[in-house]
């Protein structure tokens, strides 16, 4: 059985062949620019950004549990892919729906015995949460910077259009320590954005973006009023 990532790859393939059809033309432009003209991003970096944009602008930012429900509708597959150990071929008949399985995970006795805390926390997040896992040295900081630039550029391009899409206007990036903040994270502002964004999107992005690097004693961050 394929895992979630493999299924997403299968879903992205026809989207790629359709030349990235999207309700937002900027998504198409940016992906084509990076794939056919810029060639700045490594293959793994481009694939990560491509997957992210598919989830954001095609699937419209689903929660993780919604993805699992969509792609693993069969109870046996759902239980297997999530690594739920206490439900097996003998007792699965007592569960009628996927929600029955999720409800059972919250049973204190079951959760404690099978150590489902991390799983239930992930599945019950009330916001979308994605992990783009790449090897050390593969350029994760550049991916973060590129995603921020792409999100902001699309938001700016559509700010005067009537759309109910939840555009991003602020991004908060955490670092595990001051060493990472000083030596790596500040490179977010140094990405050659001309190699990520087409010229007509680049200028408006550069004119509007503002970076704030918080110190270890800072308690407040200044953001645009009523921005998301």
Report each predicted region and the residues it spans:
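RecA-like P-loop NTPase motor core of helicase/translocase proteins
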Residues: 1-228
């Amino acid at each position: 059985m394929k895992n979630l990532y493999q299924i997403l790859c299968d879903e992205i393939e026809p989207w790629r062949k359709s030349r990235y059809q999207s309700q937002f033309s900027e998504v198409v432009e940016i992906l084509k620019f990076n794939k056919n003209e810029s060639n700045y991003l490594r293959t793994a970096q481009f694939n990560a950004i491509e997957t992210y944009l598919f989830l954001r602008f095609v699937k419209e930012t689903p929660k993780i549990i919604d993805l699992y429900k969509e792609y693993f509708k069969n109870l046996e597959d759902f239980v297997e892919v999530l690594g739920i150990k206490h439900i097996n071929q003998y007792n699965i008949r007592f569960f009628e729906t996927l929600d029955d399985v999720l409800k059972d995970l919250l049973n204190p006795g079951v959760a404690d015995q099978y150590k489902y805390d991390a799983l239930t926390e992930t599945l019950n997040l009330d916001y979308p949460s994605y992990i783009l896992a790449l090897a050390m040295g593969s350029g994760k900081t550049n991916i973060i910077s590129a995603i921020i630039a792409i999100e902001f550029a699309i938001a700016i391009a559509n700010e005067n259009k009537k759309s109910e899409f939840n555009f991003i206007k602020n991004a908060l990036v955490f670092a595990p320590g001051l060493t990472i903040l000083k030596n790596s994270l500040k490179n977010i502002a140094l990405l050659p954005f001309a190699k990520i964004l087409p010229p007509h999107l680049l200028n408006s992005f550069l004119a509007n973006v503002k970076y704030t690097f918080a110190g270890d004693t800072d308690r407040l961050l200044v953001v645009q009023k009523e921005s998301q």
